[in-house]
């Protein structure tokens, strides 16, 4: 079977989604920039740029002390919206 091809021009989106998944995994305690860099394997400048954009769009937020990131309000609202639509158990 052929491997699925990546959608052309979607590298930044895939990277941002990777970061959102990391933020979700560490939402309660937050995750430091250095930990995001290590876990993602991305360059520091790339991670910083993507997290800054996600924060501007309220999909990520920084702790008041600025040391950790977690999901932002818009990411959580999307999760809540999906919970209302999709049944938790299939019939």
Predicted feature residues:
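N-terminal helix-turn-helix
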Residues: 2-85, 89-90
């Amino acid at each position: 079977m052929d491997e699925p091809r990546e959608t052309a021009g979607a590298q930044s989106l895939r990277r941002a989604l990777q970061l959102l998944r990391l933020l979700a995994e560490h939402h309660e305690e937050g995750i430091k920039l250095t930990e995001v860099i290590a876990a993602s394997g991305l360059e520091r400048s790339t991670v910083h740029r993507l997290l800054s954009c996600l924060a501007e769009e309220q999909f990520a937020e920084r702790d008041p002390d600025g040391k950790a990131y977690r999901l932002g309000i818009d990411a959580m609202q999307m999760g809540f919206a999906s919970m209302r639509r999709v049944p938790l158990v299939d019939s």
